[in-house]
Amino acid sequence: VTVSKDAAGRWFVSLLVEEEISPLPPVAENVGIDAGITALATLSTGEKIVNPGHERRDRRKLAKAQRALARKAKGSANRAKARARVAKVYARIADRRRDHLHKVTTRLVR
């Protein structure tokens, strides 16, 4: 058992278990993936996977939290709270990005 806490103040517990993993049945068709800038990816079938819309809103929220942090006096309690707020926004961005990529890759595999 491993217990850890991240910068955003969230606690995580990790357990090690043994489990048999059944492989997925093979998919008949192959698909090429081209990572892009305007679209997250373009498949060889012509399908485009769009970037998540929440990314821009989250970046604005992060910029606002960072500006608030920059105005705080070093060593103050308010600065510590502002740092925690920035860490929380970063964690939310990372979580949402990871969730989106997991959903996209799962859809491609199945």
Task: Cite the ranges covered by each PLM segment.
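Substrate-contacting helices/loops that form the catalytic groove of nucleic-acid
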Residues: V3-R110
